[in-house]
């Protein structure tokens, strides 16, 4: 999912790109039955990969996939599993003096019940956060933006020039 959209819908692997795919559990019919899914394994792969690569892009599918089931308690467990996995990722990035962006392209698990009590199993259009984790987080300003701003933000943090084709702008600027 992340790979396909990050690559502009292209399935073919680009030169210099490695893909590490962690399969979701197949032993359950629906993910409310295993809301932790593969979050711990994704975090372990991230911790290994961040030592080797300048950029690692990953996806925790828990909130989305479990959110589609409409089972609130499972949704909470899914988010807790991601929280635990992210703790490991954040610790590793900070140990290395790196920077981490955490975001999503849509909501789901944050709104699993409609006003009438029926399950909401669809993606939401709620705003999503962009969380910046780094040792210098107190020396930068993080602006509000849109999804088109995420890639320019990543390029900016890497010190790379933004292509003219990108219409967004960096959401992280030096200074408070």
Where in this protein do the model-derived segments appear?
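Feature captures the catalytic ectodomains and active-site-proximal regions of enzymes
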Residues: 2-176
